[in-house]
């Protein structure tokens, strides 16, 4: 008798990861709607999206480390390279650019010319400029913190036309993280 494996029995690294763009946009718009609802009770929309992203980042760290069969990174450049290449490709189907700040040894940036998170969301004008890329900033912060690289992560988006968004994920590591790396 030929038994095929159920989806639960398949290895994690063999399951196809594709999600349709329409399903993603509906799910993400519902997340934004939920944050809009919470904002009416005095909670900032970006903070709500960032908090949701934190939870995703923690879980994504465990999953991608196992899936890609890589050792956990022990220095800042390696973890940021992993995020800008592998994590970004897993989430958004393309890699992003990693930049180091010229002003501070604690600051790095991940730049994405056209992030999906800002593409399909129309926020009412009375809410001002809401940056939905705060969700991606939360994912990066969760990923870093679960790897013991504590940092504050924020998202900044510049609109460069109708459908073009230049998003920068700004990462500022805590001084003790940079000092720990210097001592090793």
Curated annotation (Swiss-Prot):
Gene3D superfamilies: Trafficking protein particle complex subunit 3 (3.30.1380.20)
GO BP field: endoplasmic reticulum to Golgi vesicle-mediated transport
Protein topology in the membrane: Peripheral membrane protein
Domain of life: Eukaryota
Bilayer-crossing regions: none
Family annotation (CDD domains): TRAPPC5_Trs31
GO cellular component labels: endoplasmic reticulum; host cell membrane; plasma membrane; TRAPPI protein complex; TRAPPII protein complex; TRAPPIII protein complex
More details: Blood stage antigen transported to the erythrocyte surface.
Function: May play a role in vesicular transport from endoplasmic reticulum to Golgi.
Name under which the protein is recorded: Trafficking protein particle complex subunit 5
Species annotation: Plasmodium falciparum
């Amino acid at each position: 008798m030929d038994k095929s494996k159920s989806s639960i029995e398949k290895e994690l690294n063999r399951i196809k990861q594709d999600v349709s763009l329409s399903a993603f946009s509906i799910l993400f718009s519902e997340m934004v709607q939920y944050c809009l609802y919470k904002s009416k009770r005095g909670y900032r929309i970006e903070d709500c999206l960032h908090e949701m992203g934190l939870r995703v980042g923690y879980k994504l760290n465990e999953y991608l480390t196992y899936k890609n069969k890589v050792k956990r990174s022990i220095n800042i450049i390696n973890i940021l390279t992993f995020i800008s290449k592998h994590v970004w490709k897993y989430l958004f189907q393309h890699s992003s650019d990693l930049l180091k700040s010229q002003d501070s040894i604690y600051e790095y940036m991940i730049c994405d010319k056209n992030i999906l998170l800002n593409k399909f969301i129309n926020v009412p004008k009375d809410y001002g400029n809401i940056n939905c890329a705060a969700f991606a900033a939360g994912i990066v912060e969760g990923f870093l913190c679960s790897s013991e690289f504590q940092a504050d992560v924020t998202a900044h988006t510049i609109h460069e036309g109708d459908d073009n968004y230049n998003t920068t994920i700004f990462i500022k590591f805590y001084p003790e993280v940079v000092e720990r790396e210097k001592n090793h």
